[in-house]
Curated annotation (Swiss-Prot):
Record-annotated HECT domain positions: 1490-1888
Domain of life: Eukaryota
Taxonomic lineage from the root: Eukaryota, Viridiplantae, Streptophyta, Embryophyta, Tracheophyta
Name under which the protein is recorded: E3 ubiquitin-protein ligase UPL3
Biased composition (Acidic residues): 137-146, 1076-1113
EC number of the protein: 2.3.2.26
Keyword Transferase in annotation: yes
Annotated region described as K-box, given as residue ranges: 1377-1451
Record-linked CDD domains: HECTc
Its job: Probable E3 ubiquitin-protein ligase which mediates ubiquitination and subsequent proteasomal degradation of target proteins. Involved in the repression of endoreduplication process and the cell morphogenesis in the trichomes.
Tissue-wise expression: Widely expressed.
One term of GO molecular function: ubiquitin-protein transferase activity
Ranges for the ARM repeats: 227-267, 270-310, 312-349, 351-390
Length: 1888
């Protein structure tokens, strides 16, 4: 309905001339002589047939208005398009709010008619003569004038229509003075005649045949009509007749057709619903439903009621329609049941005060439907009940009646996680949230509901829900799978409603501004006395229940208190935090002392309060103090000590100082969201829109910023801020004086004995380190490296102190977070690990080797203490405790901001994404001004360009250059009409005056060009850009204009296009006149459009429906979805693709191709962390979003215009123009949106920006602003690196960065861990002054030690063997315990990052805060894999894929956006190729050579097969993976001829042909690793090694493309290979990862060498002992080792025939290691990396570990569990979860072996593995449907369905992950048929 209405409205607004411009004759027309009279009657809403309902006059008048508006010329005034838009919006309003909407619509139409009258009067003056002449000559053959009228035709018809509209407004039939245009009048008269004929047929009583025929014709006319074509339809004539026929009970056909006609009428003319209701149709339809004599009539009546209920729900309700639609629900099909429930939901939308009379009897029916099997019916039923409950919320007795029907029990069961595997298996997010809201309503308003919920154990249900939401206990749960913020809010709100309200004044909860101020400590009595007074006065039923059954309250607290504290700490939503505090406050107030004592055993409430008080959020400071006061009242002895230890007292001390002016600023700086008092004028101006934490709609008046509350008039002033500080300070002082009075200025009231002891230990450690460092320096000057006795003893002393520190931290009650932070432990340990150099002078290269040795010794010593060898199983290692303390400290100290664009703040979930995407659908208005002093270019500032926000500045340059260059050829586009060339206008010349051009020519020009767009900066796509001149100044000076807020209505891109030439450039500078915006709009004169800009389009609306367009992607002309590129190979065996590839690239150097170099230039060097300067907000965008050239698809890489010409030059071609804004140079790779946002951010100070100040204003009007960018020619003065930090890298640097930076910089990423520890630095540009810097640095050290633990442990054992403490080599293989990776995940930062990267506008503008990039780069372990993966997908592949990923994420939650324009924003371009199945490898080489560097998604088909889409594509990657593992390629190491199958994911199916082809597969039990090739290998083209290099380059491209497109590979790469990919260096210890035998032998040989060195160093004559050293009883010489690489005799390590002995054993080991993991594989790895970098930057993978990278690339390997299978599989089309066939299938799937599971996945999805996350994240979802028998004769022979099905095989649709399963009779037959289909169905795609 809504879509159809919208399209009709668009069709109306786009019509060049109106077919409905004639006045609407009423249906009672009898002849032409009465036309004037009928017009008068129509305008006064009178009818000769029947009384007209009151709303009909509005309807008729609006129809007339619409006719006039449609006739008005679309391109001559803003008002016409604005009027159409308003009409459309009003209709949407009517659907939601009939009465109120109609009043608003009436007012709007009155104003529009006044504007129209003025407009028509102007046109009357201009064209009266021409219009009169035209009207005299006009006749019914007007069609012929179309070709002869030229430009004059549309203008004359427009003028005529406008005159008619004016005369019609004047009334008295004067509109007949001008006849309508021929087409309109002819069609109207024909239509009128037909309507009269139909009406007479309907009235032919007694002639049922005529009536049936007339009804049939009427239904046909209404079904194909539009609102405009039926504008003359007389509702008041037809509806009474139709209602009468609806009661024609003797003829069911007549009743059915009458009901159908009414349905069509309400659909096509929504305004007619009022008349339908007025004439009593609703009661007739209800009667037809209740009798249910004819099923088709009942269904049609339902459809009609659904349409009517959308406009008039109350009328339907009063007519008894609610019970009517629900009474006989079981008789209808599922589809009709959904219609019935949808109708019921409409009727419950706005219930009147007496609704209970109509609703209550339906409640039992609706409650029973909550158990219904259909999810849509269930959803509508829950909506009905939620709306009923909300309507009855003020009436407890009515709510009790609701709850009496079992509503609460049913709803609680539905939301329970135990009910349906996570609670949302069958419920959408909105339904689930609605049910929780329903329970909240019942709990708050109904004593019975409250009691029922508590007795049901609702607290444990809520606990399970929240623990599964990823915000609490398990921080590793994917944010993508966590619940939306609004749902979490509702859950916490339900918990809040389950506790009685607090007595007034006890706790000032943050619900309103006044509560904070009035609830001061001085006015409040103590909780105990206050409670007693309340008890005496009145005890509510809730309090009585909790008093009678205190165990209910205790269980509530035990269940929810720990979860609420965790949610408060991890949520980035202010409203949720405030609600959590409300629940905690109530819980503390109503709990007894004994209860609180039991609660604090599981929850550290003191630490929580300390954190809240330190957070400095004014909305919660007073309530937190009051909660602390309650605790001190109830348990003074306990909390008087704990508050000191946990830092509550310290935080209160700081708050006392807040009231003093000198201490005001720290309060504002520390907040996580919005700094509060130090506000710039700009922020205060916009603070009414500021809402930093995404507050929910439930409390929209309460922004979670430091400008508290909703009353912006009062609290947004310095006075209010001062009052607030005074209130907080006085409360804190009162609390401190009452409970912690200070004695004579003693400042150490918060210092405990534990803290003093810890401080002393840290002082000893630091002193010892410094002393050691000084002595070491002196010693080293004399004797170089020192290993003297004093050093060893000093190390022992230091490690002893560290052991004491760890013991103090790990002891029983432990050290509080406050004490830990204040003790100096972090700095002392960092100083120890960095050998005294932390945060001190730089370490010279000369001293580095010595310090490395010392650092390694300290690491080993520390691990022995922190992670002991013989750690007790039950005891937590000290290192784990230390990490936990550090995590608590980090959560307490961090203040990293979540900077949200405005649409993302007030919304959540799909609404948040939808708002961001809809904002991006608006074009931005750009004024391009010549820079002052620039004389060589023309000025273009008199034009306004409408441009796609995601177009790049490079595209703007291509568009602008021919229009501003001074060459003669460029200055001669088509001659402008009636105006001068914009570039030659005098500085002060304006074009807004009507006299600046002749009206006729200007109007004519616009009529011909109104729907035109230009293509700018995109490839094979159209970006709507309009250009116009205005009267405003040229915008010189400030880079970004801040205009006044103009038109604030909703605006789609098509609307913007239609009104582009009509918009006014408003600026903050006052205009020359004081006219209102409406007056200014009316005075605008149309301006010229440059002919060179225009590309003719038939209709702008076509742009919206063009599926081949993609707004974001840089698809090349070849990437058209309709074409499939057949990749054909030469017949010769020579690898065509590889040869081509080799000729274009230097295979040995790792250099990139031209495309890769361009990509490297496109991606702004990620090695430069501060490329945007120290401000940082955009530095992340530069680094992670690759400059957004690649991101938006409009960078310099490969963009072409419509004709395929390259728009963007290669990186070594200089720019023709440079752009600046606010004096700062802008990179060509920035998008327009980025450039605009960058200026908005630079215009504010850091506090405003990081405070989450608005990036886009709440009403979207920021897109109506006009932004100014200056342009000038590059010259020697300005063509420098970016002044403003836009990171405009030079071409030479960019080209180099493709090879040097991507490999060298990343090589040092992990290899420099030790050096970065010694230097005491994080590998990012986080300021060292940041309070979290040291904590992050120490966490990084500990995480590195945890990863290196096995290696360091092995070195320790090696040292012991060398010293003779260990004699057996078998003892070297001891496994080392490690700290679980989950311990390193921070539960507070994880949801922050997850929330930040869900902000579509922040991603597009590159305005993610710098900490996102800094922390993911330096400390990726802080975030779980799922969050890092989402961050990776959001930043590595560009904007289109990031937005597409967000949409998929929302769609997976069942709440994805369905708006077509928004979907186009994130739609990906696809490139289809067809390849030969028999030559996969060669085809892949060619395909990747052509398409890997493009952004289009690759889809593969096969010659001679019908399969297309996802399945064949996945199989292509799988087959290619297998081909790349062939031993004949010479790429991989192979284990010696044993037949061991690979353990890591590659067990082949023994199914005939595949197994034969797989005999050549490399055997690599531990994963694939490159085969070493000597440096002397022939690199020339055609040689074997050259091919190997090209295969690795191909592998790099394939792997990157698979990651980019979300495909899975089946390549079992070894962990060591992944480490090389990630830029980590390998050494001897890594060889065991891919060759266990060789690695173990080399390690044992290394231990022998260590023993030799030890014997040489102890002194004495040990030569004989050394020569006798043995390896497992065998002398080295007897091993017969030669200087060749083991397994590769052709690889010569050293020339000569020397045998390896004990003297040269060390050299031999070094050479073998070098050949195996370094020099022998370097060129292969470089080729791989260069191929990878052609697709996207390989350094973006460094946030993953090797095992995670394998998981990301190759998917999941876990075995299925039967219990979880049903939750992640969809059953449809004949099956449900209880079907016997489904039960059998799930059992079979659970019993499959690992090999059979791989085969099953390959069969169903096309890939042998599932994506990361398994079946749960498979997209599309695995769906099982019933397959009907292929034999039709079976039924005729009497065979049963199951017997027939037993002969069939299952089949699949891999594109949709569909398994078509016949209903087999037994499980055994199903198992047999399934395996047969799996084994025989491989290798082709045919129709099933």
């Amino acid at each position: 309905m809504e879509t159809r209405s919208r399209k009709r409205a668009e069709a109306t607004s786009a019509a060049p001339s109106s077919s409905s411009s004639s006045p609407p004759p009423p249906p009672s027309a009898s002849g032409p002589t009465t036309r004037s009279k009928r017009a008068r009657l129509s305008s006064s809403s009178s009818s000769s047939l029947a009384p007209t309902p009151p709303s009909s006059s509005t309807t008729t008048r609006s129809r007339s208005s619409r006719s006039a508006a449609a006739a008005a010329p679309m391109d001559t005034s803003t008002d016409s398009s604005g009027f159409r838009r308003g009409g459309r919006g009003n209709r949407g309003n009517n659907n939601d709010n009939s009465d109120k909407g109609k009043e608003k619509e009436h007012d709007v139409r009155i104003r529009e008619r006044e504007r129209e009258r003025d407009r028509a009067r102007e046109q009357l003056n201009m064209d009266a003569a021409a219009a009169a002449a035209r009207s005299a000559d006009e006749d019914d053959d007007n069609d012929s004038e179309d070709g002869n009228g030229g430009f004059m035709h549309p203008n004359m018809s427009s003028a005529s229509s406008a005159l008619q509209g004016l005369l019609r407004k004047l009334g008295a039939g004067l509109d007949d003075l001008l006849p309508s245009s021929g087409i309109g009048s002819a069609s109207s008269s024909h239509l009128n005649g037909r309507m009269k004929k139909i009406l007479s047929g309907l009235r032919a009583e007694g002639e049922e045949g005529k009536q049936v025929e007339a009804l049939t014709q009427l239904c046909e006319m209404l079904s194909i009509g539009t609102e405009d074509s039926l504008s003359t339809f007389s509702v008041d004539s037809f509806v009474p007749v139709l209602v009468g026929l609806l009661n024609h009970e003797s003829n069911p056909d007549i009743m059915l057709l009458a009901a159908r006609a009414l349905t069509h009428l309400c659909d096509v003319l929504p305004s007619s619903c009022a008349a339908v209701v007025h004439y009593g149709a609703v009661s007739c339809l209800v009667a037809r439903l209740l009798t249910i004599e004819y099923m088709d009539l009942a269904e049609q009546s339902l459809q009609a009621l659904k349409k009517i209920s959308q406009e008039h729900p109350t009328a339907c309700l009063r007519a008894g329609a609610l019970m009517a639609v629900l009474s006989y629900l079981d008789f209808f099909s599922t589809g009709v049941q959904r219609v019935a429930l949808s109708t019921a939901a409409n009727m419950c939308k706005k219930l009147p005060s007496d609704a209970s009379d109509y609703v209550m009897e339906a409640v039992p029916l609706l409650t029973n439907l909550l158990q219904y099997h259909d999810s849509k019916v269930l959803e509508y039923a829950s909506i009905c009940l939620t709306r009923i409950a909300e309507a009855f919320a003020p009436y407890p007795e009515k709510l009790d009646e609701l709850c009496n029907h079992g509503l609460v029990t049913q709803a609680a069961s539905l939301i329970s996680t135990s009910n349906s595997g996570g609670g949302q298996a069958s419920l959408s997010v909105s339904t689930y949230t609605g049910l929780i809201r329903l329970l909240s309503t019942c709990a708050s308003g109904s004593p019975l509901g409250f009691r029922t919920l508590l007795l049901l154990g609702i607290s444990s249900i809520l606990k399970d829900i929240l623990l599964g939401s990823g915000v609490s206990a398990n921080a590793s749960v994917s944010p993508a799978l966590s619940r939306p913020a609004d749902q979490i809010y509702e859950i916490v709100n339900l918990a809040n409603e389950l506790l009685p309200p607090l007595p007034e004044g006890v706790i000032s909860l943050p619900t309103s501004t006044n509560a904070l101020v009035k609830g001061s400590c001085q006015k409040k009595s103590s909780p105990s006395t206050s409670g007693k007074q309340e008890d005496i006065l009145k005890i509510s039923p809730r309090e009585k229940l909790l008093g009678d059954q205190p165990e209910l309250l205790q269980q509530f607290g035990l269940d929810l208190l720990p979860v609420l504290v965790q949610i408060y700490g991890s949520s980035v939503n202010g409203t949720i935090r405030h609600k959590c505090l409300s629940v905690i406050g109530k819980l503390m107030y109503f709990s007894s002392s004994e209860m609180i004592q039991s609660l604090i055993g599981d929850t550290n409430i003191s630490s929580f309060l300390a954190g809240v008080l330190a957070w400095k959020d004014p909305q919660v400071l007073v309530p937190a103090l009051q909660v602390a006061e309650i605790l001190m009242e109830k348990l003074p002895e306990t909390f008087s000590k704990v508050f000191v230890r946990e830092g509550v007292v310290h935080a209160v001390d700081q708050l006392v100082l807040v009231g003093k002016p000198s201490h005001a600023s720290p309060t504002d700086k520390d907040n996580d969201c919005v700094p509060g008092s130090a506000r710039s004028r700009r922020y205060r101006r916009r603070s009414s829109n500021a809402n930093s934490d995404g507050n929910q709609s439930e409390e929209p008046k309460n922004p979670a910023s430091l400008t508290i509350g909703a009353n912006h008039n009062s609290l947004d002033t310095p006075t209010a801020s001062f009052m607030l500080r005074e209130t907080v300070s006085s409360c804190a002082k009162a609390f401190k004086d009452k409970y912690f009075p200070s004695d004579g200025g003693d400042v150490d009231v918060g210092v405990t004995d534990d803290l003093l002891h810890l401080k002393n230990l840290c002082t000893k450690l630091t002193a010892g380190i410094d002393d050691h460092k000084v002595k070491g320096k002196g010693k080293s000057k004399a004797s170089g490296p020192f290993l003297g006795d004093f050093s060893a003893s000093k190390e022992e002393y230091l490690i002893g102190v560290i052991s004491e520190i760890l013991g103090e931290i790990s002891k029983g009650d432990g050290v509080s977070t406050f004490e830990f932070i204040g003790s100096g432990v972090v700095a002392a340990l960092l100083n120890y690990f960095s050998c005294g150099y932390f945060s001190k002078e730089k370490i010279s290269e000369l001293n580095l080797p010595k310090l490395r040795q010392e650092g390694l010794r300290r690491f080993k010593a520390f691990l022995e203490v922190a992670l002991p060898f013989d750690g007790n199983e039950g005891k937590v290692p000290p290192m784990t405790v230390l990490i936990q303390k550090l995590q608590n400290a980090l959560s307490s100290l961090e203040r990293f901001p979540v900077v949200l664009s405005h649409p993302s703040r007030s919304l959540s979930g799909s609404a948040r994404l939808s708002s961001g995407l809809s904002a991006l659908a608006h074009p931005l208005k750009l004024r391009l001004c010549r820079a002052s002093g620039e004389k060589t270019l023309r000025d273009y500032s008199s034009n306004i360009v409408l441009i796609d926000p995601l177009a790049s500045l490079a595209a703007v340059e291509e568009f602008l250059w021919p229009r501003v260059q001074r060459s003669e050829s460029a200055l001669k586009p088509a001659a402008p009409i009636g105006n001068t060339e914009p570039g030659t206008l005098p500085s002060g010349a304006g074009v807004s005056s009507p006299s600046s051009s002749t009206p006729a020519s200007t109007t004519r020009r616009h009529s011909s060009r109104s729907r035109s767009a230009i293509n700018i900066g995109d490839t094979s796509k159209k970006d709507p850009v309009h250009e116009k001149g205005t009267s405003s100044s040229k915008g010189k000076g400030k880079g970004v204009m801040k205009p006044a807020q103009a038109d604030k209505g909703p605006q789609t891109r098509s609307n913007a296009q239609k009104r582009a030439v009509l918009d006014k450039d408003t600026q903050m500078k006052p205009a020359s006149g004081d006219s209102s915006s409406e007056d200014e709009e009316l005075e605008i004169s149309p301006v010229d459009i440059d002919d060179a800009l225009v590309i003719e389009e038939d209709d702008i609306s076509d742009d919206e429906d063009d599926d081949n367009e993609d707004v974001l992607d840089d698809s090349l002309p070849m990437c058209t979805p309709d074409k499939v590129h057949d990749v054909k190979l030469a017949d010769s065996v020579d690898d065509d693709g590889l040869a081509t590839s080799g000729r274009q690239m230097n295979p040995a150097s790792g250099g990139t191709s031209g495309a890769a170099a361009a990509r490297a230039s496109d991606s702004i060097d990620t090695g430069i962390g501060n490329s945007y300067g120290s401000r940082g907000a955009l530095s992340f965008a530069a680094a992670a979003m690759a400059g957004l050239g690649a991101a938006s698809g409009r960078g310099i890489r490969g963009s072409r215009d419509l004709h395929g010409r390259t728009l963007n030059r290669s990186s070594d071609e200089p720019s023709k123009l440079i752009f600046t804004a606010a004096g700062k140079q802008l990179s060509r790779h920035l998008t327009i949106y980025q450039a605009v946002q960058r200026q908005l951010m630079l215009d504010e100070d850091d506090d405003d920006r990081f405070g989450g100040s608005d990036l886009v204003s709440s009403d979207g009007s920021r897109f109506n602003d006009i932004y100014t960018i200056m342009y000038q020619r590059p010259d020697s003065q300005v063509n420098r690196l970016s002044v403003g930090g836009a990171s405009s890298t030079t071409p030479s640097k960019s080209t180099k960065s493709a090879t040097t930076n991507s490999s060298v910089e990343s090589q040092s990423h992990r290899a420099s861990l030790l050096d970065s520890i010694l230097q005491g630095e994080l590998p990012c540009d986080l300021e060292k002054s940041n309070s979290t810097y040291n904590v992050l640095a120490l966490l990084r050290v500990l995480e590195g030690l945890n990863q290196l633990c096995p290696r360091l442990r092995a070195q320790t054992l090696s040292d012991r063997f060398a010293e003779g403490k260990i004699t057996s080599l078998d003892d070297l293989s001891t496994t080392a315990a490690k700290v679980p990776l989950d311990e390193f995940v921070n539960s507070k930062l994880t949801p922050k990052l997850a929330r930040q990267i869900q902000d579509a506008l922040a991603l597009c503008s590159g305005s993610l805060p710098s900490w996102c990039y800094q922390l993911t780069r330096a400390c990726p372990f802080l975030f779980p894999f799922q969050t890092r993966r989402q961050y990776f997908y959001s930043t590595a592949f560009g904007l289109s894929r990031a937005l597409n990923r967000l949409q998929q994420q929302q769609g997976a939650d069942g709440s994805g956006s369905t708006n077509e324009r928004e979907m186009r924003i994130g739609r990906l371009q696809r490139q289809k190729v067809r390849v030969s199945r028999n030559r996969i490898l060669d085809s892949a080489a060619k395909v990747m050579e052509m398409y890997s560097s493009q952004k289009a998604v690759l889809e593969v088909e096969y010659f001679g097969e019908v399969g297309t889409g996802l399945g064949p594509t996945l199989e292509f990657y799988t087959l290619l993976s297998h081909d790349l593992q062939k031993a004949s390629l010479g790429m991989w190491r192979s284990s010696s001829g044993d037949k061991v199958s690979m353990q890591i994911g590659r067990d082949e199916i023994e199914d005939g042909k595949p197994s034969a082809a797989n005999r050549d597969i490399v055997l690599a039990p531990l994963g694939l690793f490159p085969r070493p090739w000597p440096s002397t290998a022939d690199i020339s083209e055609g040689g074997q090694f050259h091919k190997v290099i090209e295969y690795f380059r191909l592998l790099g491209r394939v792997m990157a493309k698979a990651l980019q497109d979300g495909r899975l590979l089946d390549v079992p790469l070894s962990t060591a290979f992944y480490k090389l990919i990630l830029g980590q260096e390998l050494d001897l210890h890594d060889i065991v990862l891919f060759d266990a035998e060789l690695g173990k032998t080399l390690q044992e040989l290394r231990v022998v060498v260590a023993r030799k060195h030890y014997l040489e160093g102890v002194g004495g004559d040990n030569s004989s002992t050394i020569s006798d050293l043995c390896l497992r009883g065998c002398r080295i010489e007897d091993l017969s080792l030669e200087f060749t690489l083991p397994g590769y005799p052709e690889y010569i390590l050293r020339s000569g025939d020397e045998i390896v002995d004990i003297t040269n054993l060390e050299e031999y080991i070094s050479l073998v290691v070098d050949a195996t993991v370094k020099r022998g594989v370097t060129r292969q790895i470089e080729a791989f990396r260069s191929g990878f970098n052609q697709v996207f930057d390989i350094t973006s993978l460094q946030i993953f570990t090797p095992s995670e990278l394998d998981y990301l690339l190759c998917g999941r390997r876990e075995l299925w569990e039967v219990e979880t299978l049903a939750e992640h599989i969809k059953f449809d089309h004949g099956y449900n979860a209880k079907s016997p066939a489904i039960i059998n299938l799930l059992e079979i799937m659970g019993e499959l072996t690992a090999d059979q599971q791989r085969a099953f996945c390959q069969f169903v999805t096309g890939a042998p593995r599932l994506p990361p996350g398994g079946l749960a994240v498979l997209n599309p979802k695995l769906t099982i449907v019933r397959k009907h028998s292929s034999t039709s004769s079976a039924a005729a022979n009497g065979a049963g369905a199951s017997e027939t099905a037993d002969d069939d095989l299952p089949s699949v649709m891999t594109c949709a992950n569909y398994l078509k399963l016949p209903p087999y009779s037994t499980k055994e037959i199903m198992y047999k048929k399934l395996l047969y289909a799996i084994n025989e169905g491989q290798g082709s795609f045919d129709l099933s």
